[in-house]
Amino acid sequence: MSPKPDIRTAMNKLENPLRDDVAGPAPRHQTTQVMVGDVAVGGGAPIVVQSMTNTDTADVEGTIKQIAALARAGSEMVRITVDREEAAAAVPHIRDGIRKLGLTTPIIGDFHYIGHKLLAEYPACAEALDKYRINPGNVGFKNKRDTQFADIVEIAIKNNKAVRIGANWGSLDQELLTKLMDENAASANPRDVRAVTREAMVQSALLSAARAEEIGLPKNKMILSAKVSAVQDLIAVYQDLASRSDYAIHLGLTEAGMGSKGIVASSAALGILLQQGIGDTIRISLTPEPGGDRTREVQVGQELLQTMGFRTFVPLVAACPGCGRTTSTTFQELARSIQDFIRDEMPEWRSRYPGVENLNVAVMGCIVNGPGESKHANIGISLPGTGETPAAPVFVDGEKFRTLRGENIAADFKALVIDYIEQRYGATPKPDAAQMVPAAE
């Protein structure tokens, strides 16, 4: 017979004081700040969202168009492939085209195998880029590796450019990996093969950074990354990398995949590391659907940072998931309409309404959580659920403001959102909703 539950013990647990510390991430890992163009990375600067084009870099107009789209979506740095002479020759024209559009987004050159040759033979390319990405696993092989690595570093020093030393387990330095595997096999207590591979990743990045410093590249010109495609391995690699250095760190899960799988994998890995204070810049490496929108990776990166409370980029739209009480699609359609409307308007709103990115909007589907959740938002609406009175109360800054009825609820609510933004964040902002005059119901 099982013992009776101790009611007094249970009550004592309930009466224990709640945590009085503020919920939030661990303190940021202290890193050396690096300037990439006019964007600060590390050293306590806001975590930067970056992206990469998938155009043929030799296609100047196509690459300009995609960089502009990524930048306008919120990418704060954009990386392009520089894989051959035609691409290197195109880089200055791409930079000029972007600047003519009024965009100052830093452009990063991604180099593999022949970066030393391209940068030396196309000095205008070396000058036009804001940062060079070097992969220590393929910068050169055998006796050429150190020389070709040094060539790129010296060009970076000459042009006062930042460098990312980016190890990737798909192109890991095989000499280093073989050396560590042999040492591990001879050990009395050999480690798991994956653990040795992770160690090779970290060593590849750190040894390359140390070599770059010996050549003369200062720490405030270097960013490190060590990307793998498995979530748990990525977390372990970056934890180790952060514990052993104070270089600025770029986070990314390589080959994350398509659609929801790629979003979930990247968010799971990067979310844990960011919560631990690790990471100065991020990229969500999504495989786009054929003909899909490349800016999706920027949006996901922003949403990850915003939902975790690190930064604000666009107003948040809270919406309930729906249940049997919400058999119509009205609230879903309104939530999508408001969210799309906000994203479409943000390029203009950023300059016109400073601070609008902090706005919270709620679109709820029934009476259960609708009014309460709407009160927590700056402006929220509680639509009627199945069998409820066909009326939608609107709450502004915690107070009931108006009840909408009829067939134009969506348009009426959107108009109220615009009115709120103009009054709260416009040229002569007002402190609260008291300035908005509610209409008679």
From Swiss-Prot:
Classification via PANTHER family: 4-HYDROXY-3-METHYLBUT-2-EN-1-YL DIPHOSPHATE SYNTHASE, 4-HYDROXY-3-METHYLBUT-2-EN-1-YL DIPHOSPHATE SYNTHASE (FERREDOXIN), CHLOROPLASTIC
Organism: Rhodopseudomonas palustris (strain ATCC BAA-98 / CGA009)
Molecular function per GO: 4 iron, 4 sulfur cluster binding; 4-hydroxy-3-methylbut-2-en-1-yl diphosphate synthase activity (ferredoxin); 4-hydroxy-3-methylbut-2-enyl-diphosphate synthase activity (flavodoxin); iron ion binding
Family to which this protein belongs: Belongs to the IspG family.
Gene label: ispG
Its EC number(s): 1.17.7.3
Stated role: Converts 2C-methyl-D-erythritol 2,4-cyclodiphosphate (ME-2,4cPP) into 1-hydroxy-2-methyl-2-(E)-butenyl 4-diphosphate.
Biological process, per Gene Ontology: isopentenyl diphosphate biosynthetic process, methylerythritol 4-phosphate pathway; terpenoid biosynthetic process
Domain of life: Bacteria
Protein name in the entry: 4-hydroxy-3-methylbut-2-en-1-yl diphosphate synthase (flavodoxin)
Cleaved signal peptide residues: none
Pfam families: GcpE
CC cofactor note: Binds 1 [4Fe-4S] cluster.
